[in-house]
């Protein structure tokens, strides 16, 4: 047991030392290149790099990444491991829906996160149903809400 721990520590120290050595070698290489380059060479290199990037290229990339990341974030910061709308859920602590989303079950502990439950879907609380009326574990029509056709 002690031998395994010692080997593990030795491996970790070796990995950390090798990472530090590569960092130091790249830093010295960069310093040498900077010393050898003149100001005009540096300004020309910067101009060439900026010419290669178009104005529309950066905002689209950043915009896409931000939209993708915000879709994966939970609605409530206290809920770290929750599912967003349309993702798999099971009505358990491990696979729960974020915020006000509800898990609509399709089978035994197999469902999808939705805004609210439709009529005749399995429910526990009235707040889970779109009609706000849960009776005998099913969402029911709300007699007080009238739908007026156009």
From Swiss-Prot:
Q: Which domain of life is it from?
A: Eukaryota
Keyword terms, alphabetized: Disulfide bond, Glycoprotein, Knottin, Secreted, Signal
> At which residues is glycosylation annotated?
20, 36, 52, 110
List cystine links: 116-130, 123-134, 129-139
- Regions annotated as coiled coil: none
Q: Which residues form the signal peptide?
A: 1-18
Keyword hit for Secreted = yes
Presence of the UniProt keyword Signal in the record: yes
> According to its UniProt record, where is this protein located?
Secreted
Q: Which GO terms describe its cellular component?
A: extracellular region
The record's similarity note reads:
Belongs to the UPF0506 family.
Instruction: Note what the entry says on domains.
Output: The presence of a 'disulfide through disulfide knot' structurally defines this protein as a knottin.
Query: Can you say what this protein is called?
Result: UPF0506 protein SJCHGC03144
> Which organism was this protein described from?
Schistosoma japonicum (Blood fluke)
Name the lineage: Eukaryota, Metazoa, Spiralia, Lophotrochozoa, Platyhelminthes
């Amino acid at each position: 047991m002690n031998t395994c721990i010692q080997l593990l520590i030795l491996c970790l120290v070796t990995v950390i030392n090798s990472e530090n050595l590569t960092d130091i070698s790249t830093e010295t290489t960069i310093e040498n290149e900077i010393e050898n380059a003149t100001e005009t060479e540096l300004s020309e290199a910067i101009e060439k790099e900026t010419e290669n990037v178009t104005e529309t290229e950066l905002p689209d990339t950043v915009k896409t990444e931000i939209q993708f990341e915000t879709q994966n974030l939970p609605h409530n910061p206290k809920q770290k491991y929750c599912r967003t709308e349309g993702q798999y859920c099971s009505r358990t602590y491990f696979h729960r829906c974020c915020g006000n989303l509800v898990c609509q079950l399709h089978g035994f502990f197999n469902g999808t996160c939705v805004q609210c439950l439709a009529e005749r879907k399995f429910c526990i609380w009235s707040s889970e149903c779109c009609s706000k009326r849960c009776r005998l574990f099913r969402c029911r029509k709300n007699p007080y809400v009238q739908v007026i056709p156009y």
